[in-house]
Amino acid sequence: PAMWSSAEFWMQRLKKDTRVKDGTWVCPNEWSPEHGPTEDGVAHAQQLVRANLQICRDAINELSAAELGLTPADVEQLDNYLDHIDTGLHTEAYDGTTWKQQADQRNIKKGDLLLREWKYSDFTRGQGPNHRHMSHLMCLFPLNQVRPGDGGYYDAAVRSLRFRGDVATGWSMGWKANLWARAKDGDHARVILNNALRHSTTYGVDEGQGGIYYNLYDSHAPFQIDGNFGMCSGIAQMLLQSQDNIIEILPALPSVWKNGHVTGLKAVGNFTVDITWVNGKPTATRIVSHKGAPLVVKSDKDLTTVYVHVGQKNLEVVPTATQGAYELKDVPAGATVEIEFTKPAGLGALKAAAPAASKAVYDLSGRRVSESAHGLQIVGGHKVLR
């Protein structure tokens, strides 16, 4: 009810674009907190309202309109707004002159595309290249509206993040750590983490002295719990992401975190994930499926070549259309999946050959071989390593 009431409010409040006249629904008289002019169609509002409408549609797909007490007319209205709402995703080219010193330092060149913060006003209406608010990047985090290969919006969002710099305090540090993790730049996310762990030198209201106090409370200043929660989330995002219903292992691992182990990370689909890594590469991953949802795992290693199992049972691993992502088939609720990156596929189920075995021995092509031959063979219908 709360989700639908929110959607109804916005479907009544949205208006047709009267400036560009592109047929889209825009949020009227909005602001990009806490930054710049007030106007229709601001990216921050558009991205949030679009997400609200989409979440309602997802709930209908999952539970059915009838179960939610909605009529076919309600669903038709929602679909119409979803089809025509301004996405809040527009780009503009850097002009090569505004805030040029910071642009040069941050590798922003003339003609580079930035994500627009305002639909009608350009980036120069902002309050400078170091403003700590990143309101037009809701699409990157916490939402999931841009991704690599989407026609340039993801790259423009990451470039806008880089152009804004690392100056931040409190919750803004937490947000930037998450944004850089979503940008798959673990080293930059760690820079923000280091800044957040710098000791604050004031207990008054001085936003230029952000960091932490001796009790590890976040200093905005003063204390602000959002910074603590945000940095914890950012660390989790460096180690695991699942926003596309794909569990991605170590997506933004800082290069200096060479060896490590983490337990209890949660992933979309009600999974709990433990990861061990050595020299920046995963060596073992343990995934508990609490719901029995489809399980897709992304890794920089071909999962069809490593040992993936539930107990002693090998799992079928099938490549998906997403590069580097593999579906692990038929994982029931309550099962614990083990991925052992240092073992070849199937080895865990092999049986030791009996010393006096006299059964016929075959290679994996079905050709009979000598009983004294070595390697992976078939003996008595079982795979055997001799």
Q: PLM features: what roles do these ranges have?
A:
Residues P1, A43-R50, Q54-E62, L70-I246, ...:
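Active-site core of glycosidic bond-cleaving carbohydrate-active enzymes
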Residues P1-S5, D22-E30, A156, V191-N195, ...:
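Beta-strand segments within the central parallel beta-sheet cores of soluble alpha/beta enzyme folds
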Residues S5-L63:
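Acidic/histidine-rich catalytic neighborhood
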Residues L14-E34, D95-R106, L216-Y217, I249-V262:
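Short, surface-exposed recognition loops and adjoining beta-strand edges that mediate ligand/DNA contacts
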Residues D17-V20, P33-G36, L179, D185-G186, ...:
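Flexible loop/turn segments at secondary-structure boundaries
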Residues D187-K343:
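Non-catalytic C-terminal accessory modules of carbohydrate-active enzymes
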Residues V308-T322, E338, K343-R386:
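C-terminal outer-membrane/trafficking sorting elements
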